[in-house]
Amino acid sequence: MREALRTQRRADLVVGIPSFRNAATIGHVTEAASEGLRRNFPEMRAVIVNADGGSEDGTPDRVRASADGVPTIAGRYQGKSGKGSAFRAIFEAVTLLDAKACAVVDSDLRSITPEWIARLIGPIVRGEADYVTPLYARHKHDGTITNTIAYPLTRALYGARVRQPIGGEFGFSADLAKLYLAEPVWDTDVAKFGIDIFMTTTALARGVRVAQAFLGAKIHDPKDPGADLGPMFTQVVGTLLTLARKYADIWRPVTGSRDVPVIGEISPVEPEAVNASVRVLVEKFKAGATEQDQAWDEILSEDTRDVARKAAETGNASAIGSRFWAKAVYEIVAAAKTRDDTETLARALLPLYFGRVAALIGEVQGLDQAGAERIVNQQALIFEQTKPYLLERWA
């Protein structure tokens, strides 16, 4: 892939698409990206870069066939298998092509439109922002890692209401791409699912200008939080913990939070329903509590352990309420100050995450999207209000 990049003429804009076995959906994503580039940036030279993980289903071929005249580089990335390694290849492409700005979009999107490209890259091109995160309507059972930890913890630590810090679609400047490349993280979970939270946290901690782009509904291949999300959770949380240790001097003085500017008018849209099995979540909570019992003794406070164990024994996930959850998360974050084994810490939190998601499903039952969103924001506010507990344990 690097050889192909070296033979390519320089470009002003790059759209990066990481992929692995996405032949069924990536054609539509590529068509939307190429149309978005042509329609919104006709005077600028653009390249679509597909960084693939070695698909055998013809994924890169679908990209080449769907780009509709926009120059395309599609090939296998180097390094550890994972989304972050694909992003690293895209960052390298931005640098090698001497581009000004880049957008990255997921390869399984069914709701992407050409306007997404304009909203992700446009603020960078116009000099209004250095980093753009997505803002979309998601079903109340979708985005559970975001809703329970990535959003409220990022908001409380760094003081910015970035609603989708691990959304998958981003716009960023060439300078930021170079900064990401220079970080010594590519043998860690950042090479996998830790990449999104690494990008957002680094942007916030470095004080660059951040904006959010409203993209409508996100319709993709959703994941059942009970069935699919264990490895993603440990990678995202492990990365969050490592970064919290690195940037402690940045987040410790932060109080409250500020709004982050939104690009595009926010309009009401109805996302596709996402299934989530409370029964499976409670089973995983109970099994995980048994598995992590010794780790809880080492990491969690006595009060937190007692509530968690009782809830697991009785299968009463509703005991994992917002305030209890915020305290438990902060105990794990505080433990990361003196412990490098962030995977162990993330695994200790995983059963409580399953319990919290089961509880949250109950809390939003019968609510529409707006009502569910209020619950998520109330939880984020509780994280802000409980931050002194983290500072006390960190000291």
Where do the protein language model's features map onto the residues?
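Short beta-strand-to-loop element that shapes/binds the nucleotide-sugar donor at the catalytic cleft/hinge
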Residues: 132-144, 159
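Short, well-formed alpha-helical segments that are part of the catalytic scaffolds
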Residues: 1-4, 22-38
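Terminal low-complexity segments of carbohydrate-biosynthetic enzymes
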Residues: 11, 234-395
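A conserved acidic beta->alpha catalytic loop
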Residues: 52-60
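Active-site nucleotide-sugar/metal-binding loop of Leloir-type enzymes
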Residues: 64-65, 88-101
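Short beta-strand-to-loop acidic/aromatic patch adjacent to the donor-nucleotide binding site
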Residues: 98-110
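Conserved donor-nucleotide/metal-binding helix-loop-beta segment in metal-dependent transferases, i.e.
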Residues: 113-135
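Cell-envelope/extracellular polymer assembly enzymes that use nucleotide-activated donors
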Residues: 12-14, 47, 198
